[in-house]
């Protein structure tokens, strides 16, 4: 489908602050703009919407987050020199839990309701994925949404979503604490094709299944089974030649 556009908000200040994604989703919902896909990283939230709504949504988001779109600012590229490797580090996070919601009604406002309730309970959400595939359930288009939270927040998050499910009639709500998030990071991957393919191939070689994928310009993260965490970390280190003793500092 070429009649789509991606709108995104970004900023290091959103790390650990509940409600940023919910505010973006609510801005779209209030304008009756439907979200077709969602993808996030720690510092960025992206939504795919209808191309015809793009300019209007940019204006609304600029008002919601007090960003001046008319200001002329020089943006300096931070791409690393070409002789630097595209991936500078690999990180494994085993303190995550995955919450999945099946068959969320594909109407404006659903994502806003879900993540506003989580924010009201002071639950910070890390990765968010909304499937592109649309399921028709009882003549109602639906999509699946999955997200990760800290393990300490998993039970409360499940309870919040289960209560909401009674109101909006989603499908199954499930939680899984036995996961790990594996990430590769590096500013050199910008404009460097093949990084994701190498990352995924290294996991496939070890027969490790990927449950979720999130990306940004400088980071690719996969959610995998917790029992595969160390094996996956070692495989990705080897694939990108990061097994040496040299210490590399990765900017936040």
Indicate where each model-derived feature is located.
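A conserved regulatory-domain signal marking ACT and ACT-like small-molecule sensing domains
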Residues: 1-252
């Amino acid at each position: 489908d070429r009649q789509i556009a991606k709108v995104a908000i970004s900023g290091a200040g959103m790390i650990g602050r509940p409600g940023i994604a919910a505010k973006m989703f609510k801005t779209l919902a209030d304008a009756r703009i439907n979200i077709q896909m969602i993808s996030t990283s720690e510092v960025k939230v992206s939504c795919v919407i209808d191309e015809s709504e793009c300019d209007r949504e940019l204006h609304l988001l600029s008002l919601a987050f007090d960003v001046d779109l008319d200001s002329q600012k020089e943006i300096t590229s931070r791409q690393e020199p070409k002789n630097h490797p595209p991936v500078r580090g690999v990180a494994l996070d085993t303190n995550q839990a995955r919450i999945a919601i099946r068959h969320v009604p594909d109407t404006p406002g659903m994502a806003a309701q879900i993540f506003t309730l989580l924010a009201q309970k002071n639950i910070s959400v890390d990765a968010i994925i909304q499937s592109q595939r649309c399921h028709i359930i009882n003549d109602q288009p639906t999509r699946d949404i999955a997200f990760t939270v800290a393990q300490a927040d998993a039970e409360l998050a499940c309870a919040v979503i289960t209560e909401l499910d009674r109101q909006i009639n989603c499908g199954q709500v499930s939680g899984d604490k036995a996961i790990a998030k594996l990430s590769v990071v590096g500013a050199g991957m910008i404009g460097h094709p093949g990084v994701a393919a190498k990352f995924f191939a290294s996991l496939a070689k070890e027969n490790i299944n990927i449950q979720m994928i999130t990306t940004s310009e400088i980071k690719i993260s996969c959610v995998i089974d917790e029992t595969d965490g160390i094996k996956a970390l070692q495989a990705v280190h080897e694939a990108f030649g990061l097994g040496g003793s040299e210490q590399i500092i990765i900017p936040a």
